[in-house]
Amino acid sequence: MGKTNDWLDFDQLAEDKVRDALKPPSMYKVILVNDDYTPMEFVIDVLQKFFSYDVERATQLMLAVHYQGKAICGVFTAEVAETKVAMVNKYARENEHPLLCTLEKA
């Protein structure tokens, strides 16, 4: 009896599946956007609280947001980036600030 599945290359299928499984996850930039109302001290607080920056680095990023209109706070996987954006925006609203945090594909 001859092989009926000669056209199927199970080794190749398995190799393709492993290669697909090992692709690195998509990464996203988390960005703070400047506004005319949020105090600089609050932006520094956000950068320390949600992105674990020390006061010096948080101040540098806050100044970048202020003078350049926006700054990248970090690059994360989709789930982490979405969570950070949601947490920062919620924290800003709870403190009655219009600070906007967004994400975009890296």
Curated annotation (Swiss-Prot):
Pfam families: ClpS. InterPro entries: ClpS (IPR022935), ClpS_core (IPR003769), Ribosomal_bL12_C/ClpS-like (IPR014719). GO terms for biological process: protein catabolic process; proteolysis. Binds to the N-terminal domain of the chaperone ClpA. Belongs to the ClpS family. Involved in the modulation of the specificity of the ClpAP-mediated ATP-dependent protein degradation. This is ATP-dependent Clp protease adapter protein ClpS. It comes from Citrobacter koseri (strain ATCC BAA-895 / CDC 4225-83 / SGSC4696). The lineage of its organism: Bacteria, Pseudomonadati, Pseudomonadota, Gammaproteobacteria, Enterobacterales. The gene is clpS.
